[in-house]
Amino acid sequence: MYPILDEKTKITGVDYQYLYQQLWVFNEVNKLKPKDHYDIGSTYQMSGYIAGITNAHFLDIRPVKVDIDNLELLEGSIENLPFEDNSLESVSCLHVIEHIGLGRYGDNMNINGSEIACRELGRVVKKGGYLYLSTPIGRERVCFNAHRVFNPNTILNYFKDFELEEFNMVDDEGKL
């Protein structure tokens, strides 16, 4: 047993970044209607919802054990994705790349972990495919061992061969 002292609030707490980014991806996948959608390390919950509209695949370094129709669970690392080059039409990776290489989730320590992850994402998304990516942006820094914050240009440089179609931001107060 342990005391829970911070849940008696006047309103329900909301993690706006996670709520809005998952809703954005769900709506985009629903519009695109790909045969398959792959999520790399975001949340199995979102992948479970997407499984209601298309074949969903969730890959994470830490396996999850849930039984959801139309959802394939895969164990693997974003630093070495188990997919062929240019093979995936629809891929999401939400609030993941900023953690890679810091050891927080059992990944190897690697100063270039985020760059390697982005290179792998770029490798597997096929020409004309879609990559839905989110990450903290701001003054570039490492908040060891929690996450990195990126200058937007750093991310654009990691994905030079991609065309940016949409840029959205959710601030710390939950405003779009």
Positions of PLM-derived features:
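Acceptor-substrate binding/catalytic loop of class I
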Residues: 111-112, 133, 138-157
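Class I SAM-dependent methyltransferase SAM/SAH-binding core
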Residues: 23-24, 31, 36-81
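Class I SAM-dependent methyltransferase Rossmann-like catalytic core
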Residues: 1-33
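Short alpha-helix
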Residues: 119, 146-171
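A short glycine-rich, Lys/Arg-flanked "PGG" loop and its adjoining helix->strand segment in the class I
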Residues: 109-130
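A short acidic, Gly/Pro-enriched loop at the edge of an enzyme's catalytic core
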Residues: 79-91
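A conserved beta-strand element that flanks and buttresses the S-adenosyl-L-methionine
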Residues: 92, 97, 101
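Conserved catalytic-core motifs of eukaryotic protein kinase domains, centered on the activation segment
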Residues: 102-107
